[in-house]
Amino acid sequence: MARPHIEPFCDRDEAFKKLILPGLSSGMRYKMLSFDDDTGACSMTTQFDGGYKRAPGFSWSEWEMIIIEGEMKVGDQVWRKGHYCYVPPGYAMPEISSEQGCLALVMYNTGAPSHEESTEHHPLAQVNLYHSVDSFMDIPWAAGNVAKPSVASGCMIKLLNYNPRSHAMTFLYCMTPNFYQDNISYHDCAEEGYHLWGTSWMMQFGDVPTGGYFWRPAYINHGAFASEYGCIALGRTDSKLFNHFHYNPWSTPVQNADRSEARIYQRDPLLYKWAFSKDHNHPHGPEDFEDTMVRRGDEQGHDLEQFKTQGKTHDHWHGHDHHAPESEHHHHHHGDGEDHHHHHHD
């Protein structure tokens, strides 16, 4: 999903615009939250005006929606605040209307907003994937440890949608009053969030109030986190959510990505060798900045003055110099107690 980093942003600072697209009924207004220039996929705060009505039909894009305020009639059902739906491409929805008007968060995931009038599903539609639920009333809160390592206690979730192939998720999350988590996080996936109610605080971006929104591509630092009075928000990821926690606020997205790769190398060396190093029988692992960064306090014998003046040229306490001229490719691998010489042939 090629959307730029958007953070911080609050839709309360923007005015609604009329949504005029072929097939979509008049009476819709929107605030664009994020937009994919490649596919037309987008997330919008959408106002359905009083008296709005749309004929039965389907979209060429999968889409999701959660009601923020008001009521919407969908077929013979009435959806109220907190009602959520996931609609696969080609799934024909019944007539949609709103007598008094309705505010919703609408997300088109795989293409631009579209509507083809039809009372029948498209022949290729995966109709079994459709679902809707009153997320406020009919789903209990669960501990936020769906992803491990987990966030601090006091952050809870309700899982709304899950893709078993990509592990992409849509979920509600809440922070209890006085929630606090002091570390920094990044992920291997894009992450999206919209505050339905309440304010949270993030070290890099400040307060995120009601109507606050972010689209955060992979490997961007965020946190520490806090919420004085609590908040509730909708969150989404485009693949598996894994919390890479650390305490270095100056690491870059490139360094964070290298660290993620390093953790694969450390955790699954055979997988790493197969996936990344098919033509090299002794791969050198990528850098994990937490293993190499200079730390305050006990430096375990590192010559800090030499480090400061000569960059990475430094002697370790165990008594050898990686950069000595006579041992240009001489490495000591911690843990096996053996010296290994690597001969590189051109």
Could you tell me what each predicted segment is?
Residues 1-38, 114-167, 259-308:
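A short, N-terminal "cap"/entry segment at the start of jelly-roll beta-barrel domains
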Residues 69-70, 197-199:
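Glycine-centered positions in the ABC transporter ATPase nucleotide-binding domain
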Residues 24-59, 73, 77-81, 88, ...:
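Conserved short histidine dyad/triad with adjacent acidic residue
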Residues 280-289, 293-346:
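Histidine-centered metal-binding segments
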Residues 65:
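Structured binding elements
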Residues 28, 78-79, 89-118, 189, ...:
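Ligand-binding loop in jelly-roll beta-barrel domains
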